[in-house]
């Protein structure tokens, strides 16, 4: 509206983005892919760090996502083979 009111020919397009991937009518949102890759990479590093200890342990990782679990689900990308960690994703 402002551009039109000052006589400018500029056209503006708005593109919603969220790393949570929780917008309706979209397959995926801008920002989700890089956030999912970051989560998977971080979880992989946590797994590698936890594997150096001789004692068995449980590691709990909290991942953001408001009311959507897409980023949490993306942590499964850290798996290298069936049965690899993360074992439980909630």
Task: Indicate residue ranges for each PLM-predicted region.
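Short hydrophobic alpha-helical runs that function as membrane-insertion/retention elements
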Residues: 11-13
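Conserved phosphate-handling catalytic cores of large alpha/beta enzymes
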Residues: 25
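Short, ordered loop/turn segments at secondary-structure junctions
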Residues: 15-21
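Accessory alpha-helical/coil subdomains and C-terminal extensions
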Residues: 1-9, 29-90
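A broad, low-specificity signal for short, low-complexity segments enriched in glycine/proline
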Residues: 21-22, 78
């Amino acid at each position: 509206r402002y551009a039109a009111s000052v006589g400018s020919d500029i056209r503006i397009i708005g593109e919603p983005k969220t790393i949570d991937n929780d917008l309706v009518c979209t397959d995926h949102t801008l920002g989700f892919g890089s956030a999912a890759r970051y989560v998977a990479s971080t979880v992989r590093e946590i797994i590698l760090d936890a594997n150096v200890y001789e004692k068995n342990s449980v590691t709990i990782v909290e991942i953001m996502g408001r009311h959507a679990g897409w980023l949490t689900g993306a942590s499964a990308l850290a798996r290298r083979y069936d049965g690899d960690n993360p074992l439980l994703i909630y």
